[in-house]
UniProtKB/Swiss-Prot annotation:
Designated gene of the protein: rpmJ
SUPFAM superfamilies on file: Ribosomal protein L36
Record GO biological process: translation
Lineage, opening ranks: Bacteria, Pseudomonadati, Pseudomonadota, Betaproteobacteria, Burkholderiales
Record InterPro entries: Ribosomal_bL36, Ribosomal_bL36_sp
Protein known as: Large ribosomal subunit protein bL36
Gene Ontology molecular function, alphabetical: structural constituent of ribosome
NCBIfam families per UniProt: rpmJ_bact
Alphabetical keyword list: Ribonucleoprotein, Ribosomal protein
Top-level lineage group: Bacteria
Source organism of the structure: Polynucleobacter necessarius subsp. necessarius (strain STIR1)
GO cellular component, one term: ribonucleoprotein complex
Amino acid sequence: MKVLASVKCICRNCKIIKRKRVVRVICSSDARHKQRQG
């Protein structure tokens, strides 16, 4: 899980979602693409 100021989709399987006012990126193909804004 990377904590970044601006989250971006890395591949086409990445999805941007909001959970409890936190913007996250989840990826079904590569777990290393997981990100959180903060």
